[in-house]
Amino acid sequence: MANNMFDFHNEVHLRGKIFDIVEKKYYTDFFLSCGNNGREYRFKKRNGQYSRDTINVRFFKTEAKTYPKQFKIGDRVTVTAVLQNIVDRHTQRGKYLEVWGLNMMSVADDKAKDLNNVQYRGRIVSAKAINDNYIIINVKTVIKKKIKNTRENTKFPFIEKEFVSSTATGMRFPNGGAKDLVYTRYTPGTWVDMTGTVQGRKNAKTGKHTQRFVAEKVNIIGEVQKIDLRNQKI
């Protein structure tokens, strides 16, 4: 975790089974089947089995070339990654969540439980009440991670890369009052610390894989910024 409560933080920890590997020219996608202990995991399918998340972790550069040789479908692995919401470059509308992989290791302990955990800390960029029971907040982080240097004959085996992420998450308020909270609590500039899971599903209509960040806990850090949100958009 970050040392200071006002330090940005963006970290994803996954443990699950590889069920598909898709190699492209510049990246490789590893699809993981992960169970988790979040609220969404309580829901069962009609056959009585717990629903599992399918998460697409994308690796670039050296890892994109070497990992397909090291890991195969059916392997249980542990992954460290970061989150980032991407805007469709063609329409400039509709955001989708990417999970950028940093490293992946085999799971030595067969009894190790699946893991799906996100720790995310940053400033609220915008907030919007969908109705009086549900709001969406957009939170920005700027972090630096050490990654392998792929250049040959270098004195520096690792380099620092900056990840700028603006990630959206929804929050439910069964007792109502969400429309007031975007003006009084979840305001732009306010720091929040969030923990949750990555929820991934295959869209039944389009056949495409979609995923989102589901926050289980959202804590305000420091003071709530008093800003008028009437013209804010996500």
Q: What label would you give each PLM region?
A:
Residues 2-234:
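Single-stranded nucleic acid-binding surfaces, predominantly the OB-fold ssDNA-binding core
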